[in-house]
UniProtKB/Swiss-Prot annotation:
GO function terms (MF aspect): zinc ion binding
Keywords, sorted A to Z: Host cytoplasm, Host nucleus, Metal-binding, Zinc, Zinc-finger
Record-level GO cellular component terms: host cell cytoplasm; host cell nucleus; viral envelope
Encoding gene per record: 68
Protein name in UniProt: Packaging protein UL32
UniProt-annotated location(s): Host cytoplasm; Host nucleus
Binding locations of Zn(2+) 1: C52, C55, H129, C135
Stored InterPro entries: Herpes_env
Keyword Zinc-finger: yes
This protein's record includes keyword Zinc-finger: yes
């Protein structure tokens, strides 16, 4: 049984992960972008007529080799983990490590020497399959066309993010599908079949991944105030790349942009994906920010007071505490109160599923059910494809050129659905004007 999200898996496939990271940088000079193999691969993957390379890889392998039932169990467990993981750079990295572990385990004769390389698989393929389109989700035949329309919107805006603009003839009002019953979540708790496996208080936690993430990003502008203590760096940056943006193509932002002391890759969301105590710690911090003063003091000032007075003694892990302390007040404000993608990550993530090590016998029984598609149709905390699509294209439209009418229509629909799903953020227009 392959348990996802483990540091040991990352080190086991270090050579393959290094190849993936090498092809996840922006080129050092803009004039070389057109010939950059990683960018060409990424652009092609985002065209509306392209196929999913992960789906094609799996189909090819299964057609040539009949895998054991354990393959479907391991793959479905990874899919469940991705369903409850935040959409972040760290999630893409860990999923890439887990995916190649599954392939090498169940298809040992397949050639994986260039598994992560241009014209094979790169970060965008992991993102599209496991996080953006979620090809593994069980889908009703009645929803196929509407889902395809949402996929078109996502890839159009992601491609625009990569190139800098959306095609001039694009009309959001025509492409958008209004749906009064966007999702059918009546309960926001995990069903007993999942909670009995992952939510027991006495379960051991997997090692936290935050030190590795800090190490990989140490030379870039992300986490720039944090010092990596690694004596043996996990990864060394190649030459002729944009060091400041780091290996940013592993992130759905497809770049590292900066605005008003914030970045398009949220450091606190990366903490959620890499540290088992991050969500509880950040919830405590948010509560402290909201309740520390009774007067009408701005949120930014409240955050400033808490950071300056060193009121973070409740954080036990020194590395996590340092990362939070080194965040700007704007980054904390953006994460808790402004950014719709951050809000979705907070609401949809299950620390228990990501970081707890279940009882093997109980997990084996669960995986047999997962392999049939059970529990893979939705995230029980929140599962709204329309809201997730709007959040994604909103983030893309912050940095790529779109028409004014299109931008305002996206904001309007995003605000309406955020309110419907009780996503507590400021108006999207405000966020778009002040933060990355």
């Amino acid at each position: 049984m392959i348990i996802p999200w483990q540091k040991s898996t990352l080190y086991k496939h270090k050579t393959s992960i290094e190849c993936l990271l090498n092809y996840s940088f922006m080129p050092g000079t803009p004039e070389t972008a057109l010939d950059n193999l990683a960018l060409v691969h990424t652009y092609a993957a985002l065209t509306s007529t392209s196929t999913c390379k992960i789906c094609q890889t799996l189909y090819s392998l299964i057609s040539k080799n009949t895998p054991a039932v354990s393959f479907y169990e391991d793959y479905s467990l990874l899919c469940l983990t991705c369903l409850y993981a935040p959409i972040t750079w760290t999630s893409t990295l860990m999923t890439a490590a887990d995916f190649i572990e599954i392939i090498k385990t169940h298809f040992p004769t397949s050639d994986t020497s260039n598994f992560y390389a241009p014209q094979s698989l790169l970060a965008i393929d992991i993102q599209l399959h496991f996080y953006i389109h979620r090809c593994f989700k069980v889908l009703s035949s009645n929803d196929i066309l509407s889902t395809s329309s949402l996929q078109f919107l996502k890839t159009t805006f992601l491609q625009g993010k990569l190139t800098g603009s959306i095609p001039g003839q694009f009309c959001f009002k025509t492409a958008w599908i209004k749906n009064d019953t966007c999702c059918n979540n009546t309960s926001h708790d995990l069903p007993s079949n999942l909670s009995s496996v992952f939510c027991k208080a006495d379960l051991q936690l997997k090692p936290n991944l935050l030190p590795i993430i800090l190490d990989i990003w140490s030379a870039s502008d992300l986490f720039k105030n944090n010092v990596s203590n690694s004596e043996q760096p996990f990864f060394t940056y190649p030459e002729d790349i944009d060091i400041c943006q780091g290996p940013c193509l592993l992130s759905p932002s497809l770049g590292l942009t900066q605005k008003n002391n914030t970045t398009s890759i949220c450091p606190l969301c990366e903490c959620i994906a890499s540290h088992p105590n991050a969500i509880d710690t950040l919830q405590t911090l948010k509560y402290t920010i909201i309740n520390c003063i009774e007067n009408n003091v701005k949120l930014l000032d409240r955050i400033s007071f808490i950071l300056s007075n060193d009121e973070l003694d409740f954080i036990q892990d020194p590395i996590l505490k340092t990362v939070i302390q080194n965040c700007s007040i704007q980054e904390i404000h953006k994460h808790f109160f402004c950014d719709p993608q951050c809000a979705l990550n907070i609401k949809k993530t299950s620390t228990n599923i990501l970081f707890k090590i279940p009882d093997p016998n109980l997990l084996k029984v669960l995986c047999a059910r997962l392999a049939t598609g059970e529990h893979l149709s939705k995230n029980y905390y929140l599962d709204c494809e329309y809201l997730e699509t709007l959040a994604l294209i909103f983030k893309c439209s912050q940095t790529c050129k779109v028409g004014k009418t299109t931008f305002l229509e996206i904001i309007r629909e995003l605000d309406l659905l955020s309110k419907k799903h009780n996503i507590p953020t400021v108006k999207a227009f405000q966020t778009s004007q002040i933060y990355a």
